[in-house]
């Protein structure tokens, strides 16, 4: 017979490799099995910012911006728990996962998940075979696309403070903005409670009168200039009307949503400064502390 051990008999255990779930490897190494079969490796391979992660260095996942996971992940939920509180992570590449794929829930709602080609999921912010059905971006959280993809629909929402008095002449009303897609539609709610579409003023002070006006400026070598074009990865300053001197149908408060359909999202570039007359502007899609 083969004796009392399942690893004796027809083969030598020291010449064999036992593959186990990534988060369980320490359990196996502490068991009697490790003394019999001393080559035990995880089923999944994980990197954090291009550095290989071992079961002993999982703390790297707590601060990594880019995570890759490949192989087999029967312990998908346990792996997810290793970076569940990481608000810095902007992408999780799981294209190399061969079985037990689960869409992870990241602390950063803007995190992109690049899923295996065979994945069939409806989650937001998931890219499959170069296409995402829906990307939803949250204000004040980081975003970075390591590789380009097509988005059937993409949107970003910013909340306008009702207490903030804003118009083109009030410097306190202006805010910086940069988005990773060409914006085609901007929608908001006016102070009368109506859902409205917005149109920026042009250099002549004109706008689409079927919509509500707002101010959009880009930096030029002559200073800030009005524009009606909202391009990807370009820094702007923006201002929405909200003043007691204006009609409630013009004033904008609450959520403003910027969106586009069939958008081509490029890999996030290295941003260079845009030169102005008196100062420069540089875009960022990362969280910046004041």
Predicted regions span which residues?
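Generic serine detector
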Residues: 5, 24-26, 31-32, 54, ...
């Amino acid at each position: 017979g083969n004796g009392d051990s399942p690893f004796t008999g027809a083969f030598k255990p020291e010449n064999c490799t036992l593959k186990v779930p990534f988060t369980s490897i320490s359990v196996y190494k502490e068991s009697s099995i490790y003394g019999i079969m001393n080559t035990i490796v995880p089923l999944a391979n994980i990197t954090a910012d291009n550095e290989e992660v071992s079961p002993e260095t999982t703390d790297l996942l707590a601060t990594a911006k880019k995570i890759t996971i490949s192989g087999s992940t029967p312990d998908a939920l346990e792996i997810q728990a290793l970076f569940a509180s990481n608000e810095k992570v902007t992408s999780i590449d799981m294209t190399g996962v061969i079985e037990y794929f689960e869409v992870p829930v990241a602390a950063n709602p803007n995190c992109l998940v690049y899923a295996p080609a065979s994945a069939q999921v409806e989650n937001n912010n998931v890219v499959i075979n170069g296409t995402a059905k829906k990307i939803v971006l949250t204000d004040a959280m980081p975003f970075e696309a390591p590789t380009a993809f097509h988005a059937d629909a993409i949107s970003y929402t910013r909340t306008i403070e009702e207490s903030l008095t804003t118009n083109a002449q009030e410097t306190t009303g202006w805010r910086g903005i940069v988005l990773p897609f060409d914006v085609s539609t901007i929608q908001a709610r006016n102070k009368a409670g109506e859902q409205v579409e917005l149109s920026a003023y042009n250099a002549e002070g004109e706008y689409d009168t079927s919509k509500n006006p707002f101010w959009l400026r880009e930096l030029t070598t002559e200073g800030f200039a009005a524009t009606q074009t909202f391009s990807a990865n370009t820094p702007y300053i923006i201002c929405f009307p909200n003043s007691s001197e204006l009609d409630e149908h013009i004033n904008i408060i609450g959520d403003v949503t910027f969106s586009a359909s069939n958008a081509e999202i490029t890999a996030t570039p290295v941003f260079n400064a845009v030169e102005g007359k008196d100062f420069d502007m540089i875009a960022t899609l990362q969280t910046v502390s004041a």
